[in-house]
């Protein structure tokens, strides 16, 4: 059975972001894979905040100079995931960046992603304590 991607396109153009249950409702399908096939066909982005549970069309975000876009307190990044976003900010910071600075910038807890990046040897860590 073929599902009409216009239902998803219309929903997302109207409210800008949606969750998987909302997208399933728009398509009239309970199948997760049907939603993801439709999103892939349309081109989409996943939120870095809220554990990636929000979706938008790739054409919708208007990213700021930092590569971030927020809609109704849901964060999206050019990099996509929180892990990739955190790594970019660390990599681009000449003097490094603290977890607190990243938290303030991204409005989400970044300690877990920073630990994962460190354990994977993708970032270094310095103790700034006196």
Identify what each model region corresponds to.
Residues 1-53:
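Eukaryotic partner-binding/assembly regions in large regulatory complexes
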Residues 1-16, 78-94:
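Positively charged, polyanion-binding regions of nucleic-acid-associated proteins
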Residues 17-26, 93-105:
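Short acidic, hydrophobic short linear motifs in intrinsically disordered regions
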Residues 23, 50-51, 101, 113-114, ...:
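Short loop/turn and capping residues at structural boundaries
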Residues 29-38, 106-119:
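Short amphipathic alpha-helical interaction segments
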Residues 40-80, 119-130:
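Charged low-complexity interaction tracts in eukaryotic proteins
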Residues 60-92, 100, 105-112, 116:
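Phospho-regulated, low-complexity intrinsically disordered regions of nuclear gene-regulatory
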């Amino acid at each position: 059975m073929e599902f009409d991607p216009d239902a998803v396109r219309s929903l997302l153009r109207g409210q800008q972001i949606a969750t998987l249950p909302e997208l399933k409702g728009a398509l009239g399908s309970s199948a997760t894979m049907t939603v993801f096939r439709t999103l892939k066909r349309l081109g989409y982005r996943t939120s870095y905040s809220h554990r990636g549970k929000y979706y938008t069309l790739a054409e919708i975000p208007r990213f700021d100079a930092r590569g971030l876009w927020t809609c109704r307190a849901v964060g999206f990044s050019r990099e996509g995931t929180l892990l990739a976003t955190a790594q970019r900010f660390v990599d681009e910071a000449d003097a490094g960046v603290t977890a607190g600075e990243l938290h303030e910038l991204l409005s989400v807890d970044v300690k877990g992603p920073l630990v994962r990046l460190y354990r994977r040897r993708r970032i270094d860590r310095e103790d700034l304590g006196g």
